[in-house]
């Protein structure tokens, strides 16, 4: 046990000694490092104080004993420095060695000394001898002295420019005085400039190799989690697109003032291997290549320093480097080239149409992509270096200073590259702008307007089938079509990039003529006075000699003029403000003596002004004033206020082709026919075409251009009080909107159409024609001989006094008339209710289960096989002569029976729908009203009277005597002729149905006969095959009160 105790005590003693030694070593190391850092800072400060006076100068320092004759063009460099105003200083070697030792510039040709920024002649001369690419620029000591001097000046002025870029934003004097981080940055920048000049001599990448590596890079990241889409896009970069850059020194000269031209990837003669930044090579696998190269370098440095190079450490370094390589940076490069390719393909068509602006835009993105590609590649390598160094120094005591140094230098390089990119991109944009200027000078035309012209030509080509069909669609011989070429993003982007937004307009309007499906290239003689001036808001087609369509095919911006001014709002920010001097109306002079169609639905009549919480959206309205001619015209209105002077002819105004708001059409104050005031509610869900000011942003590196322009959108108005007011003159017919409209007729003849929506139409006085159309409408004819058509929906038709024609249409409708005139009530489809007046009414329920009530007067009821279960309630006087016409029934196929007080007729034919006709209270006694139908006539003209039926049912038990009470005529042509005469009389008077319209006089015979034949068809008259023969036997009665009408009507 004592032995183990001794061993343990000895081990403990040794551990404590090792700990003391380690602490002692740490303290020594720490103190040494602190002392070294302190001494370096003191030396830097000492040197800095000595060079305050010269810190902003560049001095060429030459040892007095240095023999420059062995150099390559050395004396030309010295002379060039003198010509450029660079001080040439000959010093003793001892003085130079002191500077080298103090600032570590012994191996550099550029450094900081007590004299300022110093070019060391021997090192520079050795550099030129070493790198033939530079020395060949300078040349030997023989040759054209002037040429050599110029080339020498290029080298030294290039170095000056590099320094200016490196030290941009650093006050060198203050940096030297403070001795802080900015001095370190300056020293690192000077060192960097030396390295950059050295890299001129090194091989650079070629475009083709770079393309391949980017594509391979895409393959690698495609399988990485979350980066699949990025990888696939990178693989789509076109090699040919990159290889055909044609990028010359005129474009890349601003990259570090031309000194670092090797970074621009433009040397076609260089090796196909890719060399980036400080010589790190991108292999075919970009990530792997950079990671491997950087990792190997850093691991070697760790090994030399005696630090760990184990597997975990190497993995940490490699993973850190991989993370530092950003796929998004390469994706941005890919996007530039892809956009260039996309625009380039688009440009081909318009180049053939006379506009090459899209090609110029494509060129910009191509060259910008090349610039971005070079800088991105370099920055990627630098990021990998910094990340790897940071990982390698993790956990090491000496790591932090190394990390700060490397990070600072690589950050500085990246900053220089990023700073240099802007002038390069501006140079490209300026070059393209010069091409635009040259074109305008040559052709004397606005370049961007020419772009709109090309877009319009393409529109005509693409839309020819549609445009040429308008003549037929609107039933006119000629079409005058106005289109607006709206703001174009490519044209706007080109104007922004070149800084020429003030020369651009928000679009351009065009007028084209089509006739017989053909585009008229030139204006025909009779259109020689056509006026279309969108700046004044004037359109004139009054001299057209044919029926004409005036149509705004696309939304047309409000009339007026535009002006623009480009101003700078920030260091890199510019805005081109738009000022619109708008007109307050459009004035259209229409065709004088021919019918025309005016489609204004795409006319923009509201220009957005402002928005506020209290007042909502506010607008400037542009009124439409349209003077029509003497023909029959049609006008389709937009959402703004209008003044229509229709002139002579039958003119129709339409509100249903677009969203025109909730209408109130008022003719109650009219002193002449065709005069109406229209108020339209444009709030709520009403969508209007409104003109708005938008902006497009485009960027040239850091420079951002904002261009304002006019555009339009179809949207809700956003103003609860927004209204439009129309004044209509000499308008014969109005078609409402697709909302709930209210029509108030005049004391003259009104023709109203409700269109869609649940509408209220009131004709007031006059012989009116009202159409409910779709929706659940209410139509009131009031006084006059009116025609009311319910259309679709469950409608209510009130004919009022007069001779009225009411047609319910589809839906469950209610039809009602007043007075003692002649009225036609037709239910149509659906379960309808028809109420006659005290006059002579025609009641035709149509399809469905209908209720028909004729009232007083001699009424005419119609029932057919397509009718459903109808109920007739005729509450008339005993002197009335009511008739029921069975339109397509024969008595032989009808069964009659008494059910309570009702007379019931039903069909027994399988082809019929087995509907039941009930004549209510037929048998009711002790009532002052007569509920019987005096005559029932079948399709063949055979007639049964109420008296016949009464006698039959009174003596029903004696069935063999029934035929003695029937009429003696099996068929009688005079019965049908009499029916036709009665129907013609009712229909002719009802709503003036048979009167010819549109100013003609007399009877419209065709319309009248058509209505009569709808009820009494000649096809149903006197067909002898229907009177007996096979299948015409009687049915046995199962009830003493039931009998076939055919047996009752047939006399022996």
Curated annotation (Swiss-Prot):
The Swiss-Prot or TrEMBL record describes its family as follows: Belongs to the RTX prokaryotic toxin (TC 1.C.11) family.
User: Where does each Hemolysin-type calcium-binding repeat begin and end?
Assistant: 744-761, 762-779, 780-797, 798-815, 826-843, 844-861
**Species of provenance:** Actinobacillus pleuropneumoniae (Haemophilus pleuropneumoniae)
The UniProt comment on domains reads: The Gly-rich region is probably involved in binding calcium, which is required for target cell-binding or cytolytic activity. The three transmembrane domains are believed to be involved in pore formation by the cytotoxin.
Free-text description of this protein's post-translational modifications in UniProt: Palmitoylated by ApxIIIC. The toxin only becomes active when modified.
According to the lineage, what is the superkingdom?
Bacteria
* Transmembrane regions listed in the UniProt entry: 248-265, 275-334, 372-418
Its protein name is RTX-III toxin determinant A from serotype 8
Can you tell me which residues the record assigns to a coiled coil? none
| Xref: Pfam families | HemolysinCabind (PF00353), RTX (PF02382), RTX_C (PF08339)
Q: Does the keyword Transmembrane helix apply?
A: yes
A GO molecular function term, named singly, is:
calcium ion binding
């Amino acid at each position: 046990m004592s032995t183990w105790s001794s061993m343990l005590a000895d081990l403990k003693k040794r551990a404590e000694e090792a700990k003391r030694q380690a602490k002692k070593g740490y303290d020594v190391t720490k103190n040494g490092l602190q002392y070294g850092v302190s001494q370096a800072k003191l030396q830097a400060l000492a040197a800095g104080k000595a060079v305050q006076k010269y810190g902003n100068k560049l001095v060429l320092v030459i040892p007095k004993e240095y023999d420059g004759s062995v150099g390559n063009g050395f004396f030309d460099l010295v002379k060039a420095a003198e010509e450029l105003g660079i001080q040439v200083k000959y010093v003793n070697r001892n003085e130079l060695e002191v500077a080298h030792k103090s600032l570590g510039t012994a191996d550099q040709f550029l450094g900081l000394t007590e004299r300022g920024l110093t070019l060391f002649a021997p090192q520079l001369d050795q550099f030129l001898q070493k790198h033939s690419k530079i020395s060949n620029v300078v040349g030997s000591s023989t040759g054209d002295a002037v040429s050599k001097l110029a080339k020498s000046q290029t080298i030294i002025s290039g170095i000056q420019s590099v320094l200016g870029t490196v030290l941009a934003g650093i006050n060198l004097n203050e940096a030297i005085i403070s001795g802080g981080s900015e001095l370190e940055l300056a020293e690192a920048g000077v060192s960097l400039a030396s390295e950059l000049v050295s890299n001129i001599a090194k091989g650079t990448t070629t475009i083709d190799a770079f393309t391949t590596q980017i594509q391979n890079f895409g393959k690698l990241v495609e399988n990485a989690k979350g980066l699949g889409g990025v990888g696939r896009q990178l693989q789509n970069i076109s090699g040919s697109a990159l290889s055909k850059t044609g990028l010359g020194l005129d474009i890349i000269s601003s990259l570090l003032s031309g000194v670092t031209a090797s970074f621009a990837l433009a040397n076609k003669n260089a090796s196909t291997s890719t060399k980036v930044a400080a010589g790190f090579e991108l292999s075919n696998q970009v990530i792997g290549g950079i990671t491997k190269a950087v990792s190997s370098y850093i691991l070697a440095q760790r090994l030399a320093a005696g630090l760990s190079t184990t597997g975990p450490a190497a993995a940490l370094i490699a993973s850190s480097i991989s993370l530092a390589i950003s796929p998004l940076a390469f994706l941005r490069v890919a996007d530039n080239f892809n956009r260039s390719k996309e625009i380039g393909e688009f440009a081909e068509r318009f180049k053939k149409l006379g506009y090459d602006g899209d090609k110029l835009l494509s060129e910009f993105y191509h060259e910008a992509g090349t610039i971005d590609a070079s800088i991105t590649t370099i920055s990627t390598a630098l990021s990998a270096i910094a990340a790897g160094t940071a990982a390698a120094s993790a956990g090491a005591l000496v790591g932090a200073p190394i990390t700060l140094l490397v990070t600072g230098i690589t950050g500085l390089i990246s900053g220089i590259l990023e700073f240099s990119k802007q002038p390069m991109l501006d140079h490209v944009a300026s070059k393209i702008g010069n091409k635009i200027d040259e074109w305008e000078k040559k052709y004397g035309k606005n370049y961007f307007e020419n772009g709109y012209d090309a877009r319009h030509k393409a529109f005509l080509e693409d839309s020819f089938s549609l445009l040429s069909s308008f003549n037929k669609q609107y039933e006119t011989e000629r079409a005058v079509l106005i289109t607006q070429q709206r703001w174009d993003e490519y044209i706007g982007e080109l104007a922004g990039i070149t800084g020429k937004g003030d020369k651009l307009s928000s679009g351009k309007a065009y007028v084209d003529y089509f006739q017989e499906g053909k585009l008229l290239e030139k204006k025909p003689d009779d259109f020689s006075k056509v006026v279309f001036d969108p700046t004044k808001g004037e359109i004139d087609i009054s001299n057209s000699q044919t029926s004409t369509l005036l149509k705004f095919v696309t939304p047309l911006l409000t009339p007026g003029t535009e002006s623009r001014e480009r101003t700078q709002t920030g260091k890199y920010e510019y805005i081109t403000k738009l000022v619109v001097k708008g007109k307050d109306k459009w004035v259209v002079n229409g065709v004088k003596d021919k019918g025309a169609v005016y489609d204004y639905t795409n006319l923009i009549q509201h220009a957005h002004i402002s928005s506020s919480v209290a007042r909502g959206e506010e607008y400037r309205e542009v009124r439409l004033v349209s003077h029509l001619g003497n023909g029959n015209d049609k006008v389709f209105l937009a959402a703004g206020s209008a003044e229509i002077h229709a002139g002579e002819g039958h003119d129709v105004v339409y509100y249903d082709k677009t969203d025109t708001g909730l209408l109130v059409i008022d003719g109650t104050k009219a002193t002449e026919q065709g005069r109406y005031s229209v108020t339209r509610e444009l709030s709520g869900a009403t969508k209007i075409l409104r003109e708005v000011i938008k902006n497009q942003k485009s960027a040239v590196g850091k420079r951002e251009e904002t261009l304002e322009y006019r555009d339009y959108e179809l949207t809700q108005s956003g103003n609860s009080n927004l209204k439009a007011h129309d004044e209509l003159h000499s308008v014969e017919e109005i078609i409402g909107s697709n909302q709930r409209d209210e029509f108030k007729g005049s004391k003259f003849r009104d023709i109203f159409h409700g269109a869609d929506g649940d509408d209220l139409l009131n004709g007031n006085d006059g012989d009116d024609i009202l159409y409910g159309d779709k929706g659940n409408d209410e139509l009131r004819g009031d006084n006059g001989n009116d025609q009311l058509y319910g259309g679709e929906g469950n409608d209510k038709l009130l004919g009022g006094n007069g001779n009225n024609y009411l047609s319910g249409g589809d839906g469950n409708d209610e039809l009602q008339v007043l007075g003692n005139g002649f009225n036609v009530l037709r239910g149509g489809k659906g379960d309808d209710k028809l109420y006659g007046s005290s006059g002579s009414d025609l009641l035709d329920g149509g399809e469905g289960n209908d209720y028909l009530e004729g009232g007083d007067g001699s009424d005419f009821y119609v029932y057919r096989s397509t009718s459903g279960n109808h109920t007739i309630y005729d509450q008339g006087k005993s002197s009335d002569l009511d008739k029921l016409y069975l339109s397509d029934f024969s008595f032989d196929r009808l069964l009659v029976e008494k059910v309570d007080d009702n007379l019931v007729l039903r069909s027994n034919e399988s082809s019929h729908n087995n509907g039941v006709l009930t004549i209510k209270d037929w048998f009711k006694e002790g009532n002052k009203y007569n509920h019987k139908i005096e005559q029932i006539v079948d399709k063949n003209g055979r007639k049964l009277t109420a008296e016949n039926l009464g006698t039959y049912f009174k003596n029903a038990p004696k069935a063999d005597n029934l035929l003695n009470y029937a009429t003696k005529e099996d068929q009688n042509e005079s019965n049908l002729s009499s029916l036709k005469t009665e129907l013609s009389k009712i229909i002719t008077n009802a709503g003036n149905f048979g009167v010819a319209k549109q100013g003609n006089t007399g009877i419209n015979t065709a319309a009248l006969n058509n209505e009569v034949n709808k009820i009494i068809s000649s096809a149903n008259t006197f067909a002898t095959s229907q009177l007996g023969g096979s299948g015409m036997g009687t049915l046995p009665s199962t009830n003493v009160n039931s009998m076939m009408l055919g047996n009752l009507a047939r006399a022996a």
